[in-house]
């Protein structure tokens, strides 16, 4: 992604910091949660992060790695705009993706690796393709 594209994505997200869902059903598990839905739906106007993730993902084709997926809000944001040729690796040390549905969990493009020890070189090399590790 070049600098001009990145600036455009950031600008568009600033002017409309809400996810434009491709599949609104992905957010069904969080829709009635009065704590976390504030963040993903940006109900107070202070949480455009998930919209930015969504917008960035829609402009990327390849492997996406998310570090820290607590509750799964980032996974929802990324998955909704994940291209058919892309993969998502989402890693956390805590196994809590309560808002991620079975459709996402069973998608072969999605790899949710919780309780992941990033310092274990054997696990890292076994999980990722050799050329993708830098």
For each feature predicted by the language model, list its residue ranges.
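A short alpha-helical cap/connector motif
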Residues: 1-134
